[in-house]
Amino acid sequence: VDNATKRQLKKKDQFVALTTSGVHWAEEHRRKTIIAAVTLVVVVLAAVGGYTFYQHRTNEADTAFGAAMQVYQTPLLNPAQPMPPGTKTFNSAKERAAAANTQFTQVANQFGLTKSGKLAEYFAGVTYMEEGQNGPAEDAFKKTGASWDSGLAALGKSSLAELYQQTNRDAQAIDLYNELAKGTAATVPPMLAQLQLAELYQSQGKTEQARQIYAIIKDKDKDSKGKPGAASQIASEKLNPRAAAAPGLQ
């Protein structure tokens, strides 16, 4: 074979090699593109499916929580005020709390990741407390108090402080009221926490400390026109109970 022929054959081999390599690259690129596209579709479907599932769970939780609240709001039997025939009633608040607690606990356990599930945890604590089961109530309030939702966390801490007061742990209650008084939660406004703290001091006989807090609230809780707010009015009554008892003499 002469040199010219050899060169032609060599070029042909190079062309075949390049063509083969190009085909392989194209096929590999196409395969990767398809895999990437399929993966993207799977991710999108998973996201849509996950959202749909979450919405379904949320709706279930809302319905279950609503049913538990209906039980909790059931009227108590009052012989002096007969209820219409067929109206469900409970003989006592403790009996009602026990019935509602069963449902709140179930909602909290089954739908704990939803907003209604977290609210159910809080109301489980409330109903445990009404039943006199302080241990489980404390656990529920602590769990609620650790929530990422600041409004819900404030409710949990406020109820926990109340429980501490009822179980002679005033120092722990004071710590929580001071924390809430520095907060911004709409569910437990700072002024409310300050009022609760002042009332605790008053119950301990620490009248001067209570009066200092009432005086701060009285001066601070006013609108832009200087009109006293609800907390200011309560503080004024606490500072001057005689005037509050006989408003006509002012």
Labelled PLM ranges:
Residues 107-117, 131, 145-154, 181-190, ...:
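Short solvent-exposed coil/turn linkers within tandem alpha-helical repeat scaffolds
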